[in-house]
């Protein structure tokens, strides 16, 4: 309510001033949700607070109120994660994967990856992802090639293509079925365990096939793989040493 009121009349914190302690108020909301393991529909709450102010006759002149307040809360979430020594690129990647209504999920996902990124699980995830992403980026760069994120199993030439598609579908099914009680370590472990199938594909399949249809189909497969990883957390934004 306080945040909506001040943002509504454009009394937002600046880089040097925060006379109404709005940063502290926003950080309090973040801490309340995370430390009590709660999710809340922040967008609905902002909309409700706006309607309360207007019903009481307050003039809210800021037309970008909701968007600016959401950005402000996510910035405070980033600050909170920095306090917890979560890498900034991991924090941003997690934020980019979800909206403000999933603050607790954003934090837990980032925290878990931050703890595992330099361990074998993290190394396996990124070696698999980068190998696929690098080939995909190289083939799509400055070329007239449009992919549809679907692949045609009918023109697969070997078992390695079939196995990769099967693994992608297994991962997608897992992520579709997880709920708010997600085991974040298990989720990352599942991604890491895909390395064997992914590397077998690259070791035995020539993506840049002479047949353009087969080549495109294999690139579609790689795009599906990368999007499956990115739908969990935006791995493309994370730096690897």
Task: Indicate residue ranges for each PLM-predicted region.
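Amphipathic alpha-helical "coupling" segments that flank catalytic cores
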Residues: 1-241
């Amino acid at each position: 309510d306080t945040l909506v009121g001040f943002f509504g009349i454009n009394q937002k914190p600046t880089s040097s001033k925060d006379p109404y302690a709005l940063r502290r108020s926003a950080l309090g909301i973040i801490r309340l949700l995370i430390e009590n393991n709660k999710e809340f529909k922040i967008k609905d709450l902002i909309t409700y607070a706006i309607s309360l102010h207007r019903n009481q006759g307050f003039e809210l002149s800021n037309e970008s109120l909701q968007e600016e307040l959401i950005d402000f809360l996510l910035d405070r979430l980033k600050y909170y994660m920095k306090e917890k020594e979560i890498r900034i690129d991991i924090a941003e990647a997690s934020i980019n994967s979800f909206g403000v209504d999933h603050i607790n999920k954003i934090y837990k996902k980032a925290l878990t990856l931050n703890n595992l990124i330099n361990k074998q699980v993290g190394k396996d995830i990124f070696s698999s992802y980068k190998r696929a992403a690098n080939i995909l980026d190289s083939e799509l760069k400055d070329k007239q090639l449009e992919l549809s994120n679907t692949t045609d199993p009918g023109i697969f030439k070997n078992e390695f293509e079939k196995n990769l598609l099967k693994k992608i579908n297994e991962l997608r099914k897992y992520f579709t079925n997880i709920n708010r009680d997600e085991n974040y370590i298990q989720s990352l472990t599942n991604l890491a365990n895909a390395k064997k199938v992914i590397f077998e594909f690259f070791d035995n399949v020539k993506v840049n096939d002479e047949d353009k249809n087969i080549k495109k189909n294999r690139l579609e497969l790689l795009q599906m793989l990368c999007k499956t990883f990115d739908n969990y957390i935006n791995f493309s934004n994370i730096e690897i040493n």
